[in-house]
Amino acid sequence: MIEIDGDNLTLEDVYSVSVLHEPVELSTKARNKVAEIHRKFLDLISSGQTIYGVNTGFGGLLNIKISREEEIELQRNLIRSHSAGVGKYLPTDVVRSIMVIRANTLAKGYSAVSTELIDALLAMINKDVVPAVPEFGSVGASGDLAPLAHIGLAMMGEGQAFLNGELMRSDIALSKVGLKPYEFKEKEGVALINGTSMMAGIMALVTSRAYRTIENAVRSSLLSFEALRGTSKAFSDWIVSARPHLGQIAIAEKMRKYLAGSKNVEKSDKEKVQDAYTLRCIPQVYGAVLDTLEYVSSVLVTEINSATDNPLFNGKEVVSGGNFHGEPIALAADFLSIALTDMGNMIERRIARLVDTNLSGLPPFLVKNSGLNSGYMIPQYTAAALCNRNKVLSYPSSADSIPTSANQEDHVSMGSTSTLKLLEIEENLEYIVAIEFLLGAQALEFSQDPISPVTKAIYTKIREYVKPLDKDRPSYLDIEKIREIMNKNELINAA
C-alpha cells in the first residue's frame, strides 16, 4: 500500500501505482490536516470575502461576482466547460500517474478541498476506473486545465472512462465497481484542474522509462563495440576522472566492467590508437544524458510534492499566486528531449557503421550472400527515420508561448506539449536501441575472438528470442520482440 501525505511521494511510488497497480491511500496525518484547513476555508467563505474561483468567475471573467447560492454550480460548470480536449486518449497508466500526483498535491492542504475529493480520486485509482483524457488542450498555465477537467468530468459521471481496458460512460464504470459520481464542493473544481499534474504525470513515467532505456543502451553498445573491435583505453578511470562529470564517470565504469574479459577488446587495446567518436565517446555522451536525467528527476520530485493550485489557503489567508505555471516542467522536459534525441543520434551512427562494410570490415549489411540478400539494410533506415522524427520533436515548446483567456493569462509554458513530445521521443529511442541490439547480435555472428562474459550473456538472451539472419526475412517482429524484452528488463538482468 502506497501512502500519500503531500510531501514524500517518490517517482518509484508513482510508477508502482500507475503501472504496477499498487493500491494507494491518504495518510492519517494528511487527512487530519486537509480536514482542518477545509473547515477553516468554509468559515472564510461564509464571511463573504471575495475569493477567486470560489465566488468569482475564472480567467478573463475574474471580475464577475458569483452569488453564495451559485458557488457549487460554478465548480461543476467549470469542469464541464473546460472539458474541451481533443485527440487520442492518453494511455491509462499515464492517467493513473496524473491522478495520484494530483491527489498528492491536494493532500498538502493548501488547496482547501475536502478529504472526500481526495478519497474519490484514490478510489477510482484503486478500482481502476480511468478517465478518458484527450491528449491535446493544455497550454501548461493555468496548469493543465482541459486534461484535468476530463478527469473531473468522469468523476461526476458525465464523461467517459476505461474499466478493465474497455471504454464506456463514466457513470456506468463507476456503478460497476460500486462508486458513486462525485459532487464537487466550493473551490474543488478549480483545485482539481488548476495544476501541473498532467505534465508531471507524463514526466514521472518517462523518467522511469528513460533510466531503463539508458541501461539498455549501454548494453546494446557493448555488442556494437565488440563487433567493431573497439579499444577500451578511452574508458580508463584516469581519463574520465580528468573531467569528473558524474555521469561520464558512471558510464565509463560500466563499460570497463562489462567489457572485462573480452579477447576482442584486449586485442584492439594493443593494436588500435583510437576509435570513431560513436565508440570512443560513449561515456561522454551517455554520461551527459544521465546527468540531464538526474537533474530532471530532481525537478520532478519537487513538483509532485508541491501545491500547484490557485488560489492557495494556508489556514489564515487566501492568496492568488502562480504555482500553476508549468515552466519548471516545460524547461526540464525540453532539456531531456534534446538529451534523449542526441543519444539516439549516436546509436544510429553505430548502426550505420555496422552495416557499412567499408567501416566495419563485416559482410555488407551483416548477411552472407549479400546482393541476393539485402540483410539488415532497412533497419538502419528505420533508425534514421526515428532519429529524424526525434529531431523535429526536440524543438523546445517552452520557447513558444501563446497568450490565452483574453490576455489575462498572457504567458504560458506549453509544458504539456513538451511532455507529450518527450513521451514519443523516449518511445522512439527504445526502438533505436532495439535495432542496435538486433544488428549488434548479428554482427557478432562474424566475430572470431571471444567476447566478454557480459556481452556473451546479452547475446545469448537475444538468441532465445531472435535467431541469426541467414537469409532475408521480415525484421519488424524481431525489433518489436527485442523492445519487449528490453522493457521487461531481461537484457539488463542477463548479466
UniProtKB/Swiss-Prot annotation:
Coiled coil: none annotated. It is an enzyme of class 4 (lyase). It is found in: Cytoplasm. The keyword Lyase applies. InterPro entries: Aromatic_Lyase, Fumarase/histidase_N, HutH, L-Aspartase-like, Phe/His_NH3-lyase_AS. The modification 2,3-didehydroalanine (Ser) is found at S142. Its main location: cytoplasm. Its EC number is 4.3.1.3. It holds the Pfam family Lyase_aromatic. Pathway: Amino-acid degradation; L-histidine degradation into L-glutamate; N-formimidoyl-L-glutamate from L-histidine: step 1/3. GO terms for molecular function: histidine ammonia-lyase activity. There is a cross-link at A141-G143 (5-imidazolinone (Ala-Gly)). The keyword Transmembrane helix does not apply. One of its GO terms (cellular component) is cytoplasm. Contains an active site 4-methylidene-imidazol-5-one (MIO), which is formed autocatalytically by cyclization and dehydration of residues Ala-Ser-Gly. One of its GO terms (biological process) is L-histidine catabolic process to glutamate and formamide. Signal peptide: none annotated. It catalyses: L-histidine = trans-urocanate + NH4(+). Keywords: Cytoplasm, Histidine metabolism, Lyase. Belongs to the PAL/histidase family. This is Probable histidine ammonia-lyase. The gene is hutH.
